[in-house]
Amino acid sequence: MSAAHKNLLAVWAKEPKDLVAVEKALNELTKVLSASSDLNDKQSALASKDLYEISVLLAILKHDFETFDDYINQMHTYYTMAPENSENKHLMTGLHLMFLLAANRLSDFHMLLEQIPQKEQTSNAYISTPVRIEQSLMEGAYNKVVLTEKNIPSPFYTIFIRIMLDTIRREIATSIEKSFKVLTAKDATVMLLFDNDEQMKKFGQERKWHLDGERYVFEIEVAQEKPVNLDTVRVATQTLFYAKQLEQIV
């Protein structure tokens, strides 16, 4: 193993991660691999694997999804050429599926899923997690997406789940603004899938919602350029209903 390869693994293993140091170590290893006359094929293959995998994970931490998209595709090519070094393939594939969901690239999501054996789609946690999330999104069971964050196979999934939740909340909020004259802060917290009142209050302030005591008051425009997304309203209201039913049971 080259010194640059060892250094990359050591820097990556440190907590909390120094992203600048990791990027520097990646660049150093890239230079070594570009002139790898001193490395045998096995050493070069292992170094390339760690280079690609850590580049993928670093891109997630930096929210650099263009770089992520580039490296994750290189990763798939690598695993095809070096299956003996593919112990992290399921993690990488799962992260790719999560990215495609978060980017709303559903056709690409299903194309990638078709390449994965059916058994792995249900039995492997890295793969089954994005599969379940996609089903929940299609069903409008957004509360299940929230619950998924509490039981994920890798912390790197969290960023993609939060991107999806941000998108869901924006859609629900837009529908609320066009469909409700008055909504209690408590009901808004449930409908927007927040854990507590403070999160709801911050979100309301960002949307410039008018809070009158314990309720939000909206001005509904008579003429709307776009029709209300009734399905989003239905799902949000359904979420509120189920939450109230659960409170009664408890």
From Swiss-Prot:
One GO biological process term: proteasome-mediated ubiquitin-dependent protein catabolic process
InterPro entries: 26S_Psome_Rpn12, CSN8_PSD8_EIF3K, PCI_dom
PROSITE patterns listed in its UniProt record: PCI (PS50250)
Pfam family for this entry, one: CSN8_PSD8_EIF3K
Signal peptide: none
Disulfide linkage: none
Disruption phenotype: RNAi-mediated knockdown results in sterility.
UniProt KW keywords: Proteasome
Residue stretches in coiled coil: none
Superkingdom of the organism of origin: Eukaryota
One annotated Gene Ontology cellular component of this protein: proteasome regulatory particle
The UniProt record lists the keyword Magnesium: no
Domain PCI: 63-233
UniProt function note: Acts as a regulatory subunit of the 26S proteasome which is involved in the ATP-dependent degradation of ubiquitinated proteins.
Family: Belongs to the proteasome subunit S14 family.
Protein name according to UniProt: 26S proteasome non-ATPase regulatory subunit 8
Gene: rpn-12
